[in-house]
Amino acid sequence: HRHSTITGVEIDPITARIAKALYPDADIRTQGFESAKLADGFFDVAISNVPFGDYPVHDPSLNAFRFPIHDYFFAKSLEKVRPGGLIMFITSRGTMDKLDSTLREYLAPKAELLGAIRLPNTAFKQNAGTEVTTDIVMLRKLQPGETPRGPAWREVRDFTNHNWEKIPINEYFVERPHLMLGHLQLTGRMY
């Protein structure tokens, strides 16, 4: 920590003030990620609990993809970390499981999936009051000319749970069911 610099971007003023109080030596910026002036290819690590939502973000560098906000955070962070840099995010299961693979197709040739773990929908119930199935996803930005060697994670396949229900989930988790904590079941909820 002594030889590192921490930069934080937080749109909520109260949360930004708390971060500034907790980390007085950090550069905490109270603004949206899309408007933060951050150098491309500079950061060693990007860490976020990405915002949930299905609304687009206006950013000329990524507008063509029409990424919803949580996908935008992945794509924008990939621009900001250096080759070999890491992205470690808490995100909804939609990042890995949605049938629209636009984000995964965008990321896969540029970043290697180092790993992911699926948390049960109750993981944040006590402290945040939410019941959303979330994933912790870790990516490494590839070096120029490097080919990804990590596991397959672009496609969604059917997974049969303990009740013999077929559930569409990411191929990474189909091949590694031990990385899904809790019990998989179909519900009528968004995530």
State where each predicted segment sits.
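Flexible loop residues that form catalytic
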Residues: 51, 121, 142
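Flexible, glycine-/basic-rich loop-and-beta segments that form/coincide
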Residues: 126-191
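Conserved S-adenosyl-L-methionine
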Residues: 1-55, 84, 92-94, 137
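Generic "edge-of-domain/loop-turn" microfeature
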Residues: 57, 96, 144-146
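Conserved Class I SAM-dependent methyltransferase catalytic core
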Residues: 9-13, 18, 30, 64-125, ...
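Short, solvent-exposed coil/turn linker segments
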Residues: 2, 32, 55, 68, ...
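A short acidic, often aromatic-flanked loop/helix-cap motif at beta-alpha or helix-coil junctions
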Residues: 34-38, 122-126, 189-190
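Conserved ATPase-coupling elements of RecA-like P-loop NTPase cores
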Residues: 55-59, 99-100
